[in-house]
């Protein structure tokens, strides 16, 4: 079945083989050690380590090309790739050459590719401003949305209320990581600043009023099952609330988050939903339809 991928981080898609191509001094053992972690804080360190291997626009382009090829092989026809623009700026890399290289790769791909620029929430709103500005400048040129990721506890969504309002006024769609490693209050804050989709959001299951609000407002959760298990956001696969959220009527889209770091694919996430949680083929088909329904660019998604 055709699917769309709505929550995948470019920098989290870098396979070990690609890292070896980017840095010939690395060994597989070093890569394995650097990308091993036991909790969310450790995962963030691994994510930063991979980011630091991306030094040139051509490096980003290579990673994007490999990602698009893998997605195409899985039957993905539309993708919204999250680019950690905040990390690009933190590394003091010029953003324009990086984005231009990515845009060229996207244009070559048979998949429809759109971009979500992501700011680092724990760095604060002032540091996020340039990311939001870069996103607004590229509305209509591949960028469809802006969001915040990173450490929820050290970067609450309310800090970004003004930036989200300004982004919406400039034509950007809005997403926000929330309810991944912290409780329902984080999701309430994301909704309060205007988030139209919630990255992860699995802790919503703890708050009946929040579940009702998500249903009422038709705000989908971008659920990444393997990611949540690997980072310790849930204590075990059996404890993951994806099926309970689905049964309650919460809109859900399945995604991979960081497929290379979590050793998963979009196809394997659908298979996992069926195998571990009893999603039927009809329900999997509905999840696939959701992936297009909740895309930020309907023309590009529905047209595929």
Question: What annotation goes with each model-predicted range?
Answer:
Residues 1-172, 183-186, 192, 196-197, ...:
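Metal-cofactor-binding active-site regions of metalloenzymes
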